[in-house]
C-alpha cells in the first residue's frame, strides 16, 4: 500500500500534534466457496477420496473507499485545562503525560488504561517531584505530580463523546482540584485508582494530547469516523 493522504491534527497554537495516515487499498483474492464445495462433492460421490482440487480464486476489491474515509474523519471532542500556577517540575510532568497519550489508537471494543499508557512514575523514568495528594489528606512532592490534571482533561474529552465511549473505571480526588469543575476530575495512582475507558463504537478512535508550555494549557483531542447525527453533549457540575 502507499500513503494516499495525511490528515494533520493541530493544537490551537498551530503546533502539529499528530498525523493520521490514510493508505490506498489494494485488491485481494477470495476462494470461490461454491466451486470448491462442488469439486469436493463430485470427488466424494465418485469415490475418488484422493482427488486433486483446483482452487478458483476471485479478485475482490476493498470494501471501503479512501476518499470516503477521509471525508468522514472528524474531531469528536476536545477539552483543555490550564496549569499556569504550576512550577517547572509539575509543568514538565504535565507535558510528559500528554506526550505519552498522544497518537494513541483505540480500536472498537478495545479498553485502555491511563496507568498502563503512562507506566510507573519514578524519577528514573523521567518524572519530576511535584505536588501530589498523599493518603487522601495532604500534598507532598512525589514523582509525576500533576499527571492527574491530564487524566482529568482526558476524562472530560471522553465524556463529551457520549455513548460511543464507556468509562470503565474513574475515581475523584479526595481534595478537589481547581483545573476542572468539582466532580469532573479523575485521580490516578499507579498502584491505586485508574482511568479506564473503552471504545463502544464500531470504528477506531484516535487520541491526541498536547501541552502548550507557552500558554500553560494542556489539550486532549479525540478523532474518529462516527457519523455526525447532529447530537452534541455538554458536561457540567451541579454541587
Please identify what each model-predicted range represents:
Residues 2-239:
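Well-ordered beta-sheet/strand-loop patches within structured domains
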Amino acid at each position: 500500500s502507499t500513503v494516499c493522504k495525511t490528515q494533520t491534527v493541530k493544537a490551537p497554537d498551530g503546533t502539529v500534534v499528530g498525523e493520521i495516515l490514510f493508505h490506498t487499498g489494494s485488491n485481494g483474492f477470495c476462494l470461490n466457496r461454491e466451486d470448491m464445495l462442488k469439486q469436493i462433492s463430485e470427488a466424494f460421490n465418485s469415490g475418488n477420496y484422493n482427488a486433486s482440487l483446483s482452487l478458483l480464486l476471485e479478485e475482490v476489491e476493498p470494501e471501503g473507499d479512501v476518499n470516503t474515509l477521509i471525508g468522514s474523519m472528524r474531531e469528536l471532542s476536545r477539552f483543555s485545562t490550564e496549569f499556569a500556577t504550576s512550577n517547572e517540575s509539575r509543568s514538565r510532568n504535565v507535558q510528559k503525560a500528554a506526550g505519552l497519550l498522544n497518537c494513541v489508537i483505540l480500536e472498537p471494543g478495545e479498553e485502555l488504561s491511563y496507568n498502563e499508557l503512562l507506566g510507573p512514575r519514578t524519577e528514573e523514568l523521567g518524572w519530576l517531584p511535584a505536588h501530589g495528594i498523599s493518603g487522601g489528606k495532604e500534598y507532598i512532592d512525589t514523582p509525576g505530580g500533576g499527571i492527574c490534571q491530564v487524566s482529568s482533561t482526558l476524562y472530560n474529552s471522553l465524556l463529551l463523546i457520549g455513548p460511543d465511549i464507556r468509562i470503565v473505571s474513574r475515581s475523584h480526588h479526595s481534595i478537589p482540584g481547581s483545573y476542572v469543575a468539582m466532580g469532573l476530575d479523575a485521580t490516578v495512582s499507579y498502584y491505586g485508582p485508574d482511568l479506564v475507558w473503552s471504545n463502544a463504537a464500531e470504528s477506531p478512535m484516535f487520541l491526541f494530547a498536547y501541552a502548550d508550555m507557552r500558554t500553560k494549557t494542556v489539550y486532549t483531542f479525540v478523532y474518529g469516523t462516527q457519523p455526525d447525527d447532529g447530537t452534541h453533549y455538554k458536561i457540567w457540575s451541579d454541587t
